[in-house]
A protein has these predicted regions:
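Selective transmembrane helix interface/packing segments
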Residues: 1-343
Length: 343
């Protein structure tokens, strides 16, 4: 029991540290990718090739003056960024980061917890994320902050519905709500992307909107809202909001890789590697390779596509993605009936 508890604590700390490190260097990668796409050099002053730029940015944020507007709600003003940063860490506990490690006759799963309602937990926690933005925008007592927060809330709530419906079709196919079981079912080339291509397309578009990334970055639209919901924030509170975006991007990429691209499963590797622990380690490395690829896709889309107008954003969510998600559920049900999986 004590060993199990220690292992779980190690897993929590490891996932927390990896998310922090990935979030830090996602900022560096974003600036380098943007520079490449715009034929620039990018960060190259802090350390060799600029690899210490995230550290420099963190020190800069930490050293800036901490300012709280006089007419703001101080308690909620502090709670907003803390909540925004806490939510993505809470979602990471149900993601399977690998298979089982066999140590001294015991099996240790590379997952903090594999609850049988993992998908429901994931969506329940993600839906709370809107409070971090709404509280911060409202507590700032600034019209631009409030408008940005209202935009973010309506956008996230709208796209959560289409995202949820896309997952319903996947749950129908896999017959489980456990993310651990979903990953285990995708051994070999039995990836869910081949069975749910439309669901994946809907899910990834909604993921862009949920993380407030371009072309869905209307809550932070500088040309209209100054800085959006974090206009009045400075120092580490602003850093929390900006950092939360990159950790959300990391978690979203991990969820996409797990639900649709086999997670830690690596096709054909079992023919060449027979040690179960090495298979687990290589599978985890393969999962992180997929995550890095999807983080690159997030950044590539941001620096390639222009921002939507707000009416276009709402039309896409309600008039296109929602009917497509419902049609996907109907098509999945019909195919399952025709193949004899349901009666």
């Amino acid at each position: 029991m004590v060993t199990f508890l220690i292992y779980k604590i190690i897993m929590v700390v490891a996932v927390f540290a990896i998310a922090l490190l990935t979030g830090m260097y996602s900022t560096y990668a974003e600036r380098k990718i943007a520079a490449f796409l715009q034929d620039r050099v990018g960060p190259n002053r802090a350390g060799p090739f600029g690899i210490l730029q995230p550290v420099a940015d963190g020190v800069k944020m930490f050293m800036k003056e901490e300012f709280i507007p006089g007419f703001s709600n101080k308690a909620l003003f502090i709670l907003g960024p803390a909540l925004a940063l806490m939510i993505p860490f809470m979602t990471s506990v149900v993601i399977p980061w690998g298979g089982n490690l066999h140590i001294n006759g015991h099996d240790y799963a590379l997952q903090v917890t594999d609850i049988n309602i993992g998908i429901l937990y994931l969506f329940g926690v993600v839906s709370v994320g809107v409070y971090g933005i709404m509280i911060g925008g409202w507590a700032s007592n600034n019209k631009y902050s409030l408008l940005g927060a209202v935009r973010a809330s309506s956008q996230m709530i709208s796209y959560e519905l289409a995202m949820g419906f896309s997952i319903i079709a996947l749950v129908m196919h896999t017959n489980t709500l456990s993310m651990g079981e979903m990953a285990a079912q995708q051994q070999g080339w039995h990836w869910n992307i081949f069975y749910q291509p439309l669901g994946f397309l809907i899910f990834i578009i909604c993921a862009f909107a949920e993380t407030n990334r371009a072309p869905f970055d209307l809550p932070e639209c500088e040309s209209e809202l100054v800085g959006g919901y974090h206009t009045e924030y400075s120092s580490m509170k602003l850093g929390f909001y900006l950092f939360a975006e990159y950790i959300n991007m990391f978690i979203s990429s991990a969820v996409i890789a797990t639900l649709y691209f086999g997670g830690y499963n690596m096709p054909l590797i079992g023919r060449f590697v027979h040690d179960p622990n090495w298979l687990t380690i290589l599978g985890t490395c393969f999962l992180f390779a997929k995550i890095i690829f999807f983080i690159f896709v997030f950044m590539w889309v941001r620096w390639t596509l222009p921002r939507f107008r707000y009416d276009q954003l709402m039309n896409l969510g309600w008039k296109i993605l929602m009917p497509l998600a419902l049609a996907n559920i109907a098509i999945t049900g019909i195919l399952m009936y025709l193949t004899g999986r349901i009666h």
